[in-house]
Amino acid sequence: MKEIYRLVDVSYKYPNGSIALDNVNLNIYKNEVVAILGPNGAGKTTLLKILDGLVFPDKGEVYFEGKKLTDEILRDKELMKEFRRKVGFVFQNPDVMLFNPTVWDEVAFSPLHLYSKEKAIEVTDKTLKDMKIYHLKDRHPYNLSGGEKKKVSISCILSVEPEVILMDEPTSALDPKSRAEIMNLIKSFKECGKTVVLVTHDLNLACLADRCYVLNKKVIFEGKVKDLFSLNLDELNLDVPEISKLFIKLKNMGYNINEIPVTLDEAVNIISKLFQKY
C-alpha cells in the first residue's frame, strides 16, 4: 500500500508557547479515509494545516509520498504548484474560501491558474454539474445556505482533481439533509481512489473511515472506530449517536452486550444475534 503521509515525532507550539502537538507519529496510505478525533484544543486542525503545508512543525519530520515536506521545498514554485494540485484543504468555515462574485468564479479560480482557458471552463462546468450545484453558478456565494456554501467550497477543491482531500469538520452546523449529502460525497471520494483525512466530532461521520486517530496533543488511540468505546468518550467531546448511548447504558446495567453499534444497521445486527441465542 502506497504511503501518502508519514509524520515522525512531530511537535508544534502556538505563538504564545502553548503546545498544540507533542511527538505525534502517524501514517496515511493511498485510498484510505482516516478520521482525526479528539476534544477541543487537541491539535486536530493544526495537524491538518501541517499536512497541507500551511504550517511546519517545530520538531519532527513530515513526509509526503516519501519526500520530506519543508518550508524550503514549498518555496519552489513548481513544487508548490504540484503539491497544491495533489492536496486540497476544505476549511471548517466555508466563508474563508469564498471571495469571488459568483459560484462559477469561485470554482473556476484554481483551474484558470492551472489549465488553459478552454480546459478551465470545461472542468469548472463539469465539477458544478457533478456536485449538482450548476444551477447556483451565477449566485453570490454569501447568499447561499450553509450546506450550499459547503458544497461550493468542496467544488473549489475538486475542480483541480486532487488526490488527497483534507476536511476540517465537514458536517458541522449542517442540517440532516446536507450532512447526509456530504457523507455520501466522502463515500464517493473513496470509490474514486482518493485519500481523505477528516477532522470530526461526529462518530457517524467517523464510521466512514478505515482507521481513526484520537488526538489530545499526543496520539492516544489508533484503530477502528468501533474500538473507540474502550475510551472515555465524555472526555473526548465526541458526538455519540443515541443508539450507541442506549447500548452503553444497557451494558452498564449488566446486560450481555459485547459490541457497541454506531449505526442503526449495526444495532439491528447485534439484536438479531442476541435473539438467536434464546
From Swiss-Prot:
It is found in: Cell membrane. The keyword Cell inner membrane does not apply. InterPro entries: AAA+_ATPase, ABC_transporter-like_ATP-bd, ABC_transporter-like_CS, ABC_transpr_CbiO/EcfA_su, ECF_ABC_transporter_ATP-bd, P-loop_NTPase. Its main location: membrane. Keywords: ATP-binding, Cell membrane, Membrane, Nucleotide-binding, Translocase, Transport. Residues 5-242 form the ABC transporter domain. SMART domains: AAA (SM00382). It holds the Pfam family ABC_tran. SUPFAM superfamilies: P-loop containing nucleoside triphosphate hydrolases. It is a peripheral membrane protein. Gene3D superfamilies: P-loop containing nucleotide triphosphate hydrolases. GO terms for molecular function: ATP binding; ATP hydrolysis activity; ATPase-coupled transmembrane transporter activity. PANTHER family: ENERGY-COUPLING FACTOR TRANSPORTER ATP-BINDING PROTEIN ECFA2, HEAVY METAL TRANSPORTER. Probably part of an ABC transporter complex. Responsible for energy coupling to the transport system. Belongs to the ABC transporter superfamily. This is Putative ABC transporter ATP-binding protein MJ1572.
